[in-house]
Amino acid sequence: MADAMLDICNEDECNDTYGRIRMYQALQLKQPEGVHIPGERTVYRVMEEIGLNHRPKRKPNGITRADKEARKSDDLIKRNFTSEKPLKKCVTDMTEIKASDGKLYVSAIFDCYDLAVLGLAMDTNMRATLCEQTLDNAVKAYPALRGSILHSDRGTQYTSELYHKAIIKYGILQSMNSAGGRCHDNARSESMWARFKEELLYGRYDTTSMTVEQLKTLIWRYFISYWNNRRICSANDGLPPMVKRQQYYASLQEAA
């Protein structure tokens, strides 16, 4: 079993962040030939024996700032970040990363159903155009996103006229944090950014020695290739987002 665990860690550089739960789920998903999969406690013990220790988490700070005078939308999520179907309830946010030649702002839309990244955009500024581009990319990739709920904080980018017009154009139902900007009101997005930085950046890359373009390539590959398709997600019962999504649509075909 130790060899199977090491094989899992070697498949992707970010797999070394797996704790006992995700390692157990990865073993269950892959079912290595000739390997008996024991309980989580045994998995944890073996991980300790072979030096696969999970790194501690760090909490990133939010970067958007609320505009108290701007248009607001109701909180349609109310901290319920679950969804029974894809493309019905989503969250969006942005984060900041320091590079050698400036700052890179990363904006994404996550699906509450399986935590898939539906839209991703990056730029050296955090203006509303970045959020608009993220939404454009998401709808282009997933036209059925029209009519879904899209939740954000009350940052000036999300209360801007430009973003509001994009929301209307695509028939999206805009949702925002409740008055007062409580941190838990957009906890899903903040959690995703924390996981991204913990797995890809902290202790692995010195981003201040990398250019913006190098970071863009690294982040695109992480989210679109690894996060969506290969990363074990405990919230999905150990399934990568796109695997859970494929199973959902397959079940619809079987029921038809």
Segments (PLM) and residue ranges:
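Basic, flexible linker segments flanking DNA-binding modules
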Residues: 1-85, 183, 240-250
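Mobile genetic element proteins and their domesticated derivatives, centered on retroelements
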Residues: 5, 23, 43, 47, ...
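Residue-level detector of anion-binding/catalytic polar loops
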Residues: 53, 172-173
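An active-site-proximal beta-strand-loop segment
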Residues: 79-118, 124-128
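Active-site beta-loop-alpha junctions of metal-dependent nucleic acid enzymes
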Residues: 98, 102, 120-144, 159
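C-terminal domain-tail junction helix/linker
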Residues: 168, 194-256
